[in-house]
Design a protein with these regions (language model features):
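A compositional/biophysical signature of low hydrophobicity enriched in polar/charged and small residues
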Residues: 1-91
Length: 91
């Protein structure tokens, strides 16, 4: 089963478009959108072909080293998906 996570991203004022463009280019980011609310961007990360040794520590590394260090990012909140649902139920 693939590991997936949502990363909620706060940006410094005026940096949202640049951050979004940069985040969308990251290899594990499948989707990223600007949103209204407490956060500015919600990114969906998915790891399709994982080695059996993949760990949350590796996800943490990707978030802290590849996303938080993007110029304009002020903070993030990561939420790991535990169960996926499709339009027809679980899946």
């Amino acid at each position: 089963m693939a590991v997936a996570a949502y990363v909620l991203i706060r940006c410094r004022g005026g940096k949202e478009d640049r951050v979004l463009s940069t985040i969308r280019q990251k290899p594990h980011v499948k989707k990223a959108d600007l949103v209204f609310g407490d956060y500015d961007i919600i990114a969906y990360l998915e790891f399709d072909e994982l080695p059996s040794t993949f760990s949350v520590a590796e996800l943490n590394h990707i978030v802290t080293e590849e996303i938080r260090k993007v110029d304009g990012v002020s903070s993030t909140s990561t939420h790991i998906v535990t169960t996926k649902f499709s339009g027809e139920g679980r899946g």
